[in-house]
Amino acid sequence: MANRGQFGSKFGFIMAAAGSAVGLGNIWRFPYLTGENGGGAFVFIYLCCVLAIGIPLLFNEIALGRLTGKNPIGAFRDTGSNKFWIIGAILSLCVSFFVTSYYGVIAGWTIGYIYTSLMGVELSFAEFTANPSIVIPLFIGFIGLNLLIVTKDIAKGIEKASKILMPVLFVLVLVVIIRGLTLEGASAGLRYFLVPDFSKINAATFLKALSQCFFSMSIGWGIMITYGSYLSKNESIVKSALWIGVLDTTVALMGGLMIFPAVFAFGMEPNQGPTLVFQILPHIFSEMPGGNIVGAFFFLLLCIAALTSTISMIEVPGSWLIDEKKWSRKKAAWAVAIAAIVFGIPSALSKGANDTLTNMSIQFSGMTITSFMDIMDFIWGSFFIVIVSLFVCLYVGWIIGPAKIIAELSEGTPSFSTAKFAGVTAAQVWSFFIRFICPLVIIIVILNQFNVF
């Protein structure tokens, strides 16, 4: 069997797993969803989703990975899964692979914006994304950065890179936050972001917040199962998962603190959607003293956030090739990367470079989703993430039973299954959530996507 490797320390695992969770979802997606859904009201519901749904599912996936020491498909198979339940594991590999194919395109844009910010070049976002001679090389270059890390073993590659990149990411975020808070009028942005208006809360707010929770925390991707398989039995999953949740949520909140003070200081509208980062913020930076440096810092941290996420996405199908096909790590990483580039080129061409790919659309539940990239994002980055999460929930809660996972969670944290509060243990609470609360909420989300509610 090929040597899978293992994380060398608890800190390294936390940084790698938090790096996977912390990505464009926190710094790009979370702020624009907040802007579209009532500011502080959305933040409040999101935090509730993280605590009630995200953390229990994070425990679940990491423990399943460490219990078996395998990739998602191997984890299901080794715990007695039949062919039906393995569908969930296969879908998790597909999610990580196909999201990599278009996520890498967006990450490539950040590299281009680092350069234009430093040079003080005014750039039309539409013209930039429509130029294949720019976006495709940037995309390939970004995937190449991933290969430099993923081809090395776990401790020397992903763990070492994450130990460096995650602290750098936090420092860069703080630099941009401090600069934004010094702008005149920034306080209005703080109020919008942090003060909830509960009249804005409705079913749609809750559902969008829950979907963002899955996207942001790498739940339903197979990533946490894979990373859990590299975690030593001596480490506490409970403490590590709590740290991952805290770090991921902190960066999401810091993303809002970066963006909204600057948006309000320059009189911009906060509900600009996905274009907020690439169209609105460069204009704001250009108006700031020293804005080219601040802008370059901002897009550098976006690039780092994307990198710490994509290395984990490539690792998921890569670990399957290592475990099941006995490939070397280098061969598996190259195969996944090349395939991601091939499948990602249509996404790279679908923002203006090719009319067919740009204008193609699908109808789903009253929504029109336009462009190849947006269709891929909806299918793999929204819909199937939720489906995979449901599969894993039901599989652990009702097929293999929570007992094996509770035993795994109790290693390193014996109090998880022994210490009682108000007459119940944390293990009993977790078991109730994983069997009833989490599946019920996920099913409601899925049914809502089909307009049942």
Annotated model-derived regions:
Residues F11-C49, G228, V238-L242, V246-L247:
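Transmembrane helix-boundary motif of multi-pass solute transporters/channels
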Residues R4-G5, Y32-N37, L67-L91, G104-T151, ...:
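Inter-helical loop and helix-membrane interface segments of multi-pass membrane transporters/permeases
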Residues M1-W28, L57-I62, R66-T79, K83-I90, ...:
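Membrane-interface "cap" regions at the ends of multi-pass membrane proteins
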Residues A2-N3, F7, F11, E159, ...:
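Membrane-embedded translocation segments of transport machinery
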Residues G54-N71, W85-F125, A306-W320, V386, ...:
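Hydrophobic transmembrane alpha-helices that form the core helical bundles
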Residues S365-V396, A419-F453:
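A generic transmembrane alpha-helix motif of multi-pass inner-membrane proteins
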Residues L307-T310, A333-S347, K351, S365, ...:
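Hydrophobic alpha-helical segments of multi-pass membrane transport proteins
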Residues R4, G74, A107-A130, L231-N234, ...:
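Helix-loop-helix connectors at the membrane interface of multi-pass transporters/channels
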